[in-house]
Amino acid sequence: LDLTPGSHVDSYVEA
């Protein structure tokens, strides 16, 4: 899981 700020995952997790 790529939980780095601005990653593809964080893109919709913190949206």
Curated annotation (Swiss-Prot):
Task: Determine if Endoplasmic reticulum is one of this entry's keywords.
Answer: no
Keywords on record = Neuropeptide
Molecular function GO labels: neuropeptide hormone activity
For the biological process aspect of GO, one term held by this record is: neuropeptide signaling pathway
Query: Could you tell me the superkingdom of the organism this chain comes from?
Result: Eukaryota
Matching entries from Pfam families are given as: Pea-VEAacid
Q: Which InterPro entries match?
A: Pea-VEAacid
Q: Look up keyword Metal-binding and say if it applies.
A: no
Q: Which GO terms describe its cellular component?
A: extracellular region
- What's the name of the protein? Peptide hormone 2
